[in-house]
């Protein structure tokens, strides 16, 4: 975990890397790390006990109402079959009237999960929904006693988060000062030019960060019903159409949540396309020596082997070496992975010719879009001749940096 954050091994090992973490993913890892630092072992235990106590209490309360709970071993998730006089549709109607979404299984069961945000108001709301559906009267709960239904053998006996850093910063002020000390060790655009990737957006303006804490954007559940996410659907569709125009491509997917995930997705799309036209045997990826380490790492993780083509003394791709490597491997070549402009900030003058060389071999061109901001307004991947491209969330979409 620490090595992944500090060195991102694909920079060093390239095609020999065993991981491929992107800055956008590192942000989530950093947030999880700070969460553990702030709460420490005792804080994490208390949160877990609270969650499990609420779940245990609800299990007993709903069982008394006639619901049958099916998870023999549980921590935070319960699944109930309904009494004969209660239908899933009846329960759903009552829940929706109180603006609550439950999980509805295909066989008629109903379930829900508890987390650290669940409070007494939520408990009473759930109790109300299930009691009304069962046509029973219950009293409002004012306190949840600590309780556990876990078997003794499942309870952890060893210590964790024992390092000093997890046992020092448990107040807001201490945490703020700790994060500030770490920040002072870093280099950013507030200090100087950043040598790697400086042609990309490395500064996120405050206006771009505001939606992160806007209640109109955040807290939507990934499994929320379609009729409750119409605004998101409009946003996704509009963004997809705009990106089609910007990139010159025919289709867009917004599912990958980082550059590394985007690379993996793009290469899988290329593989699926080649298989669909009877070329599934192609298993080699051509990659310039100047490429970002994530490119060969992604190729290997997708099951490809890599072939490296040379660059000249100015950092440009050696077109003749690329042509020779492509020709030598044309029967097995699946794709070229190329960054435009390159990681060194160079606009390859022969990019269109490079794409033509690859296409003549029956292969596809994957363009790493890490530096997309440097070409917008001048050209786009579709015009250049690329077939697939990813756009980084922490650059093009200005999500916070994790590295």
Regions found by a protein language model. Give the residues of each.
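Flexible inter-domain linker/hinge segments
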Residues: 120-195, 199-207, 212-218
């Amino acid at each position: 975990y620490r090595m992944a954050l500090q060195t991102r091994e694909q920079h060093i090992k390239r095609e020999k890397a065993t991981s491929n973490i992107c800055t956008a993913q590192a942000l989530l890892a950093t947030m999880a790390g700070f969460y553990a630092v702030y709460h420490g072992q005792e804080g994490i235990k208390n949160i877990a006990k609270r969650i499990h106590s609420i779940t245990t209490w609800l299990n007993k309360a709903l069982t008394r109402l006639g619901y049958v709970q099916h998870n023999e071993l549980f921590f935070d998730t319960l699944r109930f079959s309904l009494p004969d006089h209660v239908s899933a549709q009846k329960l759903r109607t009552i829940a929706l009237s109180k603006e609550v979404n439950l999980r509805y299984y295909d066989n008629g069961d109903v379930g829900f999960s508890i987390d650290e945000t669940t409070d007494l108001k939520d408990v009473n709301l759930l109790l109300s929904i299930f009691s009304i559906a069962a046509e029973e009267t219950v009293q409002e709960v004012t306190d949840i006693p600590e309780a556990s239904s876990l078997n003794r053998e499942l309870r952890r006996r060893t210590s964790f988060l024992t390092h000093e850093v997890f046992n020092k910063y448990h107040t807001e002020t201490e945490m703020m000062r700790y994060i500030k000390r770490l920040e002072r060790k870093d280099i950013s655009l507030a200090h100087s030019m950043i040598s790697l990737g400086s042609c990309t957006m490395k500064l996120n303006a405050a206006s771009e960060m505001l939606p992160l804490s806007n209640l109109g954007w955040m807290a939507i559940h990934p499994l929320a019903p379609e009729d409750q996410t119409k605004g998101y659907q409009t946003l996704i569709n509009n963004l997809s159409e705009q990106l089609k125009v910007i990139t010159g491509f025919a289709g867009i997917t917004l599912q990958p949540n980082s550059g590394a995930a985007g690379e993996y997705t793009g290469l899988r799309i290329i593989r699926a396309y080649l298989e669909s036209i009877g070329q599934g045997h192609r298993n080699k990826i051509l990659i310039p020596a100047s490429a970002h380490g994530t490119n060969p790492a992604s190729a290997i993780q997708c099951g490809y082997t890599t072939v490296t083509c040379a660059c000249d003394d100015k950092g440009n791709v050696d077109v003749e070496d690329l042509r020779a490597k492509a020709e030598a491997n044309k029967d097995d070549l699946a794709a070229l992975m190329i960054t435009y402009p390159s990681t060194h900030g160079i606009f390859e003058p022969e990019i269109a010719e490079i794409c033509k060389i690859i296409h003549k071999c029956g292969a596809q061109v994957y363009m790493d879009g890490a530096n997309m901001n440097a070409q917008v307004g001048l050209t786009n991947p579709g015009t250049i001749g690329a077939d697939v491209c990813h756009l980084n969330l922490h650059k093009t979409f200005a999500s916070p940096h994790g590295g």
